[in-house]
């Protein structure tokens, strides 16, 4: 499952891809490649080991999608505090940016 969540950060509208353990890495990779081509940046949020595994695989696949055009991807991990059904959870936010 792949869901987009719109956030406002630093005065800009930003899409955050919410990744689950059931997310298809190829679909997520396509979304990452599209966002990076469009905005030079993509953000993902994963909660749990399975979701993080799918997110990392997606970054590797997306890198293969954009590499032929001379774009390299870098990935910066960060912790994210998320509220789910009133309960605080710690997740991982992956910020993917292009590097030429």
What are these regions (language model features)?
Residues 1-13:
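Short, Lys/Arg-enriched N-terminal segments with co-localized hydrophobic residues
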Residues 36-53:
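Short glycine-rich, basic-tinged beta-strand/loop micro-motifs
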Residues 49-75:
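Short, hydrophobic/π-rich interface segment
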Residues 36-40, 62-66, 93-96:
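Short, low-complexity, polar/charged sequence segments that are solvent-exposed and flexible
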Residues 67-100:
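C-terminal edge-of-domain segments
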Residues 14-40:
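An N-terminal amphipathic alpha-helical segment
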């Amino acid at each position: 499952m792949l869901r987009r969540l719109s956030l406002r950060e630093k005065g800009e509208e930003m899409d955050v891809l919410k990744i689950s353990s059931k997310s298809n890495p190829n679909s997520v990779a396509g979304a990452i490649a599209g966002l990076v081509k469009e905005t030079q940046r993509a953000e993902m949020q994963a909660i749990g080991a399975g979701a993080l595994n799918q997110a990392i695989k997606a970054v590797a696949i997306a890198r293969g999608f954009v590499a032929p055009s001379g774009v390299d991807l870098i990935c910066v991990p960060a912790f994210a505090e998320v509220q789910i059904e009133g309960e605080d959870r710690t997740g991982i936010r992956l910020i993917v940016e292009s590097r030429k």
